[in-house]
Amino acid sequence: MQIVCNEGNVIKPYLVYQKDAVAEYWIPGAFSNETASRVLEGTKKVVNDSNGTGYAAHRDDILLAGKTGTAEIKASKDDTSGTELGWFAIFTAEDTVERPILIISMVEDVKGRGGSGYVVKKDSLVLEEWFSSH
């Protein structure tokens, strides 16, 4: 998701937290600015459109963006007894946010519990704590 937030540029990852680190592009121009902007707008709709799959994490006070996903784990194409895992990536979508956040979560065995929607609901609790505690 960071490629979308950085106008199509892949930031060089750091293994050690550096409070005053300056972002260094690892793969400049991996996406065009136009493509990154389109994807970002789509991820905003996931959380902010009432029909979006991540709408349960919507907040009126902070603009968030995200992507949901569900993977079926099964032995064959015709297998109906497999399980599912759900995942959700959500991040603050404004540069002016005082306490930005990026959460990427995955939960196994969400079949019958709402798929990725189950993960969205769990992350909404984390977001509430994050934004209300400061």
Please provide the spans of the model-predicted regions.
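Active-site beta-strand/loop architecture of penicillin-binding DD-peptidases
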Residues: M1-Y25, S50-H134
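C-terminal beta-signal and terminal closure region of outer-membrane beta-barrel proteins
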Residues: E24-S50, F131
